[in-house]
Structure formats: structure tokens, C-alpha cells
Amino acid sequence: MPLELVVDKTSRRVLGLQGFGPMGDGVLARINAAAGLIARGATIEDFSTLELAYAPPFSTALDALNAAANVADNLLAGRLRYVSIEDFLAWMEEPSKAPEWMALDVRHPKEVQPFLDKYGDRWLGIPYDKVRERYRELPADKQLIIICDACTRSYEVQSFLDSVGVTNTLGLGGGFNVIRRLGVDWWPR
């Protein structure tokens, strides 16, 4: 479930939360939990360290609220640079709007292949677990939009690439999980 925190950059106070998901009850539960914290002036750190009940077979120890706070922290610290879903969708509809962009898809090759077939030179596929050995193949003259399902692997790839001096990267905020739910026309069939 994609969640987005609205935060004050200076005080790091959380001002709001929005999100969506296939079943609204999960989103509603997070918004209800967040509402109480926001009313008390909670900061990013309060959300990041929030303890919520979970059952391992059904959810993760790191809740979506924690993850959203960690993303906000990484954005404010400059450790994460991203392109919005809206800007990415505009580029997919009209590539001439950002001819310097190229998608770097780090998902499994079976997921990537239809995009390589359809979009050719606008799309590059390097599996997440191969980026460390293949990063020298990346074009230096392109703004690389790193794509995965939820932006988690994109962030990790971006962090690694930063460490080796490749900084012409942006992660796709929300990842393909969000785009898949939007039902876009350009998705390969």
C-alpha cells in the first residue's frame, strides 16, 4: 500500500498522510494511527520508530507507516532522489518531454523483457542482483530513472551507484506497483 507523508522540512513534523490500496481498511488503519500522532505534533522519527502489532505470516515487522517515514527521512537528507509518478507518466506518454531520460529497470528479466521489446533504446534492464557487476554499462549522458516494484530496490541501487560516482539517477516514486494499479495504456500486453 503506497503511503505518502507530508512533512515540514525544517521541524520534521508530519503534517499529513495520504495513501491508497486494494482494500481501504489497511489504508484507513494507517491513517487512523497517523491522525493521533499528527495531532500531538509527531515528527518523522516518531513515525519511523512507531511500534505496531503484526503477525509474521500476514505482514512485515516494518509497517508501511515506518517505511513512509524512512523515505521522508532519506528525501530530506538527500539520500533519495526521485521522479514523481506524474512526471514519469508524462514521459511515457510523450518521450520528447525528457529526451535525456532512460529507464533502468532492476526487476526480474521476465518482468523487464516486454518493456525492452516495446521501448527499445528508452529502456535498459539490469537485474537488481547484477547491478554491482554491470554498473559500468550505464550511459553517462542519460538521466536514469531506476524502476522496481515499490522503489525499495531502486533506492538501494541508487545508494550503490552514488557510492561509485554514478549520480545521474532518480528512483521512480512508488514504483510499478502504483503504475500497475492506475491501468495505463502504454503497459505492454
Predicted feature residues:
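Active-site flanking residues adjacent to catalytic metal/cofactor-binding acidic residues
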Residues: 104
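Flexible, glycine-rich terminal cap/loop adjacent to redox cofactors
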Residues: 1-78
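Rhodanese-like catalytic fold shared by cysteine-dependent sulfurtransferases
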Residues: 45-56, 60-62, 66-101, 109-145, ...
